[in-house]
Regions:
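Intrinsically disordered, low-complexity regulatory segments enriched in Ser/Thr/Pro
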Residues: 44-90
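Short acidic DE-rich linear segments
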Residues: 100-103
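Hydrophobic alpha-helical elements and their junctions with loops/disorder across both membrane
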Residues: 66, 95-98
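Residue-level detector of alpha-helical secondary structure
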Residues: 13-17, 89, 93-96
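Generic detector of low-complexity/intrinsically disordered segments
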Residues: 17-18, 26, 53, 72, ...
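Negatively charged, low-complexity tracts enriched in Asp/Glu with abundant Ser/Thr
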Residues: 1-46
């Protein structure tokens, strides 16, 4: 069964809330809600001491296509799109694992 845009929107919103993403009041040009979550990590750096790093993911759905924006310490890493909300969550989990964080 092919999913409609409304079904993908509902599944996306449910998955975002389930995985700790929050709607902070921002919307896209087409009125979609932008969900965001930030991870913090403190690492010990030789000859420097503790250093805090952050990883932020902003996600929204545009006409049935989940769009993910990645930021590492405030620097934009890029934008990615996925065919379904479940694939987007799986990709976010893998991106975070490679960056040293956990979903």
């Amino acid at each position: 069964m092919k999913q409609t845009i409304a079904m993908k929107q509902a599944a996306f919103e449910e998955l975002m809330r389930e995985h700790g993403f929050q709607y902070l009041g921002a919307t896209t040009y087409d009125g979609s809600f932008i969900y965001q979550r930030t991870w913090h990590r403190t690492d010990e750096v030789a000859f420097y001491g503790p250093m805090e790093s952050t990883y932020k993911i902003m996600a929204h759905i545009s006409y049935g296509v989940p769009i993910i924006q990645l930021f590492d310490d405030g620097r934009a890493l890029g934008t990615r799109d996925y065919s379904s909300p479940k694939r987007a969550i799986n990709a976010i989990r893998e991106i975070l694992r490679c960056a040293g964080y956990e979903l």
